[in-house]
Amino acid sequence: MTETGVIGCGCRGVTGGNFFHPGGFSLKSCFLEQSTKRNRNFFRSVSMIPPFKRGRFITKLRSVAGNSRIFSMDAREKSRSFVLVSSRHKRVPVFVMMPIDTFGIDASGCPKIKRLKALTVSLKALKLAGVHGIAVEVWWGIVERFSPLEFKWSLYEELFRLISEAGLKLHVALCFHSNMHLFGGKGGISLPLWIREIGDVNKDIYYRDKSGFSNNDYLTLGVDQLPLFGGRTAVQCYEDFMLSFSTKFEPYLGNVIEEISIGLGPSGELRYPAHPSGDGRWKFPGIGEFQCHDKYMMEDLMAVASQEGKPQWGSRDPPNTGCYNSFPSGVPFFEEGNDSFLSDYGRFFLEWYSGKLICHADAILAKAADVLRRRQEEEKSSVMLVAKIGGIYWWYKTSSHPAELTAGYYNTSLRDGYDPVASVLSRHGAALNIPCLDMADSEIPEKYLCSPEGLRRQIHDVSKKWTIHVTGRNTSERFDEMGLRQIRENCVQPNGDTLRSFTFCRMNEKIFRVENWNNFVPFIRQMSADM
């Protein structure tokens, strides 16, 4: 993709002295101040505030798609046609995610599949129960582990063959992140070793918080377009991986492999690592912290601020934003004062911060869609491209939605932060995978002003607007009858359509316990019938 402006992607950058978010939001024209000021309770429910006309400002949102040079009407039309056809049925295929410890590292440092015999038996049991397919994480840190451009697929060839022989389909998750934080740093899958060697010398290839702590689970967006990896940019590394995958598993595409989700951030989700629970820095329901203090992100911020004519805005992220475990009450930036998220600087920073995330998704999904499009042009069976977003549902009922802001979703009572995300997915013909299908507002303490239900409704609305598929997953482990019933009910969208598919997270020994299996099997069969 070509680079324009100061943000390294094919989105529109700076035009005519105004700073533009990649989605086309001008800081100087985006908001009009109303003459009437109202005193509002900071903690009132968003559902009571009319959308896009809440309080002091009126937003004028312009579509991301309208500004993109890579917009593909073919992808949009294909997506729309696909949604209309799929909505005629009411069945939801269920994929079960592989165990979190499926892969291990042997004494020689090479990856291996653990408990292969037990896995074979488990796959047969899931097939008999009516499960449609298996979701498999394909790790960058396994396949391209030792040297750049040396892809070793033998482990996945064995696993895919095993799943196919069991009569199951595949959802493949291409993972460009690490999950070592889930194992306390003493296990799991890291980023490729050659990437880590670069990171040992240059820690700024990773996200960094305001205290200087780095997060080596995923490369910072700041290096997306910088040739720091043996002459390749991060986006080129991701593209080469996807090309190698599609070449190796071409016979499976559209046949056994039905869905491919593209990793776009920590845990494969399009977001910043603003809530790092693995190392103890963050605990629910903290608001999190902005993750833009590596030198590459800060250099970009300074360049954008200078072009906006406000160089002083580029020297730091917003002050008075609290810390990881702060509550929004008493944190000035997330309230409504002069230095809040409503200020000129607050809007500037949030446009830039969220805009970098949108450009990141745009660049990678463009590469992924191009790879799959080549297969479709060769009259291969179609594969659904999928992108995951995080389920940041706490403090959702506040005006500022602080936990979403730190994660990179510029979603407030004044602005729909998921609309530009859905727009990017729409132009690339990708489906949106949403979390929290197992959750209800009534199950969460009211004092944290959570609303997984409100979040789901908002995402369903933008998905309908942009005519994209919606798939889903659970956030917490549920085997109880009520939790499974809740998932089933949430797989039916407000307009009566069903989700395209559901991924159950995840397979482990608990699922096969008699008391859980007796709930799980009826759940699978109900999902496989007309709902």
Swiss-Prot record:
Keywords: Carbohydrate metabolism, Chloroplast, Plastid, Polysaccharide degradation, Transit peptide. One of its GO terms (cellular component) is chloroplast. InterPro entries: Glyco_hydro_14, Glyco_hydro_14B_pln, Glycoside_hydrolase_SF. It is found in: Plastid, Chloroplast. Disruption phenotype: Slightly retarded growth rate and reduced starch breakdown in leaves during the night. Residues 1-62 form a transit peptide. Pfam families: Glyco_hydro_14. It comes from the Eukaryota. This is Inactive beta-amylase 4, chloroplastic. It comes from Arabidopsis thaliana (Mouse-ear cress). The gene is BAM4.
